[in-house]
Curated annotation (Swiss-Prot):
WD repeats lie at residues 13-44, 62-92, 104-134, 147-179, 191-221, 232-261, 282-312. One of its GO terms (biological process) is egg-laying behavior. PANTHER family: RECEPTOR FOR ACTIVATED PROTEIN KINASE C RACK1 (PTHR19868). GO terms for molecular function: protein kinase C binding; protein-macromolecule adaptor activity; ribosome binding; structural constituent of ribosome; translation regulator activity. It comes from Drosophila melanogaster. Highest expression in the mesodermal and endodermal lineages. The lineage of its organism: Eukaryota, Metazoa, Ecdysozoa, Arthropoda, Hexapoda. SMART domains: WD40 (SM00320). Involved in the recruitment, assembly and/or regulation of a variety of signaling molecules. Interacts with a wide variety of proteins and plays a role in many cellular processes. This is Small ribosomal subunit protein RACK1. The keyword Ribonucleoprotein applies. It comes from the Eukaryota.
Length: 318
């Protein structure tokens, strides 16, 4: 028996690149997505076999430029977004309204995250800083000492309460690990030879993976700071995510998604949508964002053709 992924449907409604997707830990029938069309969409998942996999239940307006990132609070009631309009916004999803605007970055906000307890917020920006905020939109700390020397492309909290850290990466080719208690640098991870787009922390907080221009996914041990190993790809890595319940890493590179079984470092599946267009690489929609459902059975992927594609894990007898 082996596990494969089948394309189950699409979510159509954005008018710009789908830059990020967040699944709702409390409600398996809704997800939220961010786009270059300056909106967030809350999707109701209907899982229709023939037509769309769901429909836009709510569209959230407020940002005045591309939205680069979105995350959900652990209770699923609030969304946090970051935008090229230099702000973050906290949204009450039931009301469909912004409850807080976070101002302080001097350039585009590229990444946002919630701490495990939802009390702290971190953001990364093209202004080369990382900012820590509370949920009242007060900036508590700006990390500049030992900071990135170029755009901060991604910031993430570790889900591990016993090791409170922030992981960041940037266009300076560096992955940095920060001690959350004092906002001081804990580790620098060097090994990439191109700008970095994304970093993600494993569900148990023991390791992280980074990727970008050099097409390599590097895995790092967050406890001792060592580079564990490298997974090679043949295109720019745009997104990374760990499965919540299997030892899998998903890598979005160029138009493709590769799912790695980290136990044996072998490919489980390679996903590439069949897009009806001339087969030149330039015309293939790029995969920009990835998110697993909480149960690890459904993979949502956002693309540069404004579409979300939905894959489902199925067991096949070989």
């Amino acid at each position: 028996m082996s596990e494969t992924l089948q394309l189950r449907g699409t979510l159509i409604g954005h008018n710009g690149w789908v830059t990020q997707i967040a699944t709702n830990p409390k409600d398996p029938d809704t997800i939220i997505s961010a786009s270059r069309d300056k909106t967030l969409i809350v999707w109701k998942l209907t899982r229709d076999e023939d037509t769309n996999y769901g429909y836009p239940q709510k569209r959230l307006y407020g940002h005045s430029h591309f939205i680069s990132d979105v995350v959900l609070s652990s209770d699923g009631n609030y969304a946090l977004s970051g935008s090229w309009d230099q702000t973050l916004r906290l949204w009450d999803l039931a009301a469909g309204k912004t409850t807080r605007r976070f101002e302080g970055h001097t350039k585009d906000v590229l990444s946002v995250a919630f701490s495990a307890d939802n009390r702290q917020i971190v953001s990364g920006s093209r202004d080369k800083t990382i900012k820590l905020w509370n949920t009242l939109a007060e900036c508590k700390f700006t990390i500049q000492e030992d900071g990135h020397t170029d755009w901060v492309s991604c910031v993430r909290f570790s889900p591990n309460h016993s090791n409170p850290i922030i992981v960041s990466c940037g266009w300076d080719r560096t992955v940095k690990v920060w001690n959350l208690a004092n906002c001081k640098l804990k580790n620098n991870h060097h090994g990439h030879n191109g700008y970095l787009n994304t970093v993600t922390v494993s569900p148990d907080g023991s390791l992280c993976t980074s990727g970008g221009k050099d097409s390599k996914a590097l895995l790092w041990d967050l406890n001792d700071g060592k580079n564990l190993y490298t997974l090679e790809h043949n295109d720019i890595i745009n997104a990374l995510c760990f499965s919540p319940n299997r030892y899998w890493l998903c890598v979005a590179y160029g138009p493709s998604i590769k799912i790695w079984d980290l136990a044996c470092k072998k490919t489980v599946e390679e996903l590439r949508p069949e897009v009806v267009s001339p087969t030149s690489k330039a015309d293939q929609p790029q995969c920009l964002s990835l998110a697993w459902s909480t149960d690890g059975q459904t993979l949502f992927a956002g693309y540069s053709d404004n579409t979300i594609r939905v894959w489902q894990v199925s067991v096949s007898a070989h």
